[in-house]
UniProtKB/Swiss-Prot annotation:
It comes from Emericella nidulans (strain FGSC A4 / ATCC 38163 / CBS 112.46 / NRRL 194 / M139) (Aspergillus nidulans). Functions as a nucleotide exchange factor (NEF) for Hsp70 chaperones which accelerates the release of ADP. Required for fully efficient Hsp70-mediated folding of proteins. The lineage of its organism: Eukaryota, Fungi, Dikarya, Ascomycota, Pezizomycotina. One of its GO terms (molecular function) is adenyl-nucleotide exchange factor activity. This is Hsp70 nucleotide exchange factor fes1. It is found in: Cytoplasm. Its main location: cytoplasm.
Amino acid sequence: MDPNMNNLLKWGIQNSTATQQTSDSNNNASQAPRSNITPEMLSALFGGPSEADLMKAAMEALRSDEVDLENKLIAFDNFEQLIESIDNANNLEPLGLWTPLVELLKHEEPDMRRMAAWCIGTAVQNNEKAQDKLIVMNAIPTLVSMSTQDPVPAVRKKAVYALSSAVRNYQPGTNELVKHLPGGYASGKVDAADMDTIDMIMDKLRAHPVSSSPPSAA
């Protein structure tokens, strides 16, 4: 991926959130990135990249063999911040970004799996449209497998976060979760609005014993 585009992604996120800071913080945050803008970045900015463009550029970086892990994680962080907006989260489908995002749950690099789960959790939180899409993508079984089998604690933690966001107050998601839980967990009908029961399931997933061997490919 073009390094200028990667810098542009960082600049775009920093400036898109600057208005939410206090006046002093805003001045400090805006001055630093602007001082680092290159002519190439300005040229790209004159084209007016939208947040949809930035989302697509981030995913391009995540899928590129030419981008190292450090810059992929920067792109992932930018992507996650962008989809905190429900409008951007709902744009994942028309932009064709759900499929590659879900595929990254099975990446060989733990940090990539962790960030993919984090982004999914952000996208589906209090968002029925995205929660429904996650079921269509058949991602809940993968997230259950990650939360109970992945050898890396940080990955498991984000997988549980994604599941928690996917099922709360969304009955189809809760039904799908219960269907794929290991033995010893809640079975039968679980009310998606029963936060105590949902919390118990999530707490049990967080405490699930995991072997040292890597998860089997789904």
